[in-house]
Amino acid sequence: EKAPLKQARLIHDWVRTHMHRDDSVIGCGTGDVGEILKSGKLGGKCTDINSVFVALCRAAGIPAREMFGIRLGASRKLAQYSKGAFGSADTNGVAKISGAQHCRAMFWLAGYGWLPADPADVTKMRLAEKKENGNPDVEAVNEYLFGNIEMNWVGFNHGRDFALSPQAEQGDINNFGYPYAEVDGDPVN
């Protein structure tokens, strides 16, 4: 396939089909594609899974990037498929944002600009609802998350490997999916 949109779709479908969400991974994962592929364990959380999508798009010549942000409440569009996989809120509709960090992917399509893709959320829904690929709900979520963003999410940045000044004790910061602070040279967790 030579058309970039179709290539990106094939990559999205491959990633959501062959990768799995691993809830034992800390935070959103590190997005270390080399390590994921070398280990042969095609799993992780949103940064890991969407970083594989980004890497495969780039390998096919499609500009792509991760986008780090946070969910600001319960999903309206996708809640019919999963009550917890796409954000949450209390009974008054107030967002539960502790742990709501989420990495999405974006790819560039000439004439359109940056388009969203989120195979990681397909794997999250699959695990949360104990459904397999091919299930109509999984397929509906997959269809929506290629080219759409649920409007309960806001992106903050798309950077990786930040070199802070003064330099962080741990060296470059992988991403700003979470706040980072140090006190007297010690990272605050």
State where each predicted segment sits.
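Active-site neighborhood of thiol-dependent amide/isopeptide-bond enzymes
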Residues: 4-6, 14-103, 125-128
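Active-site rim recognition segments
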Residues: 74, 78, 84-189
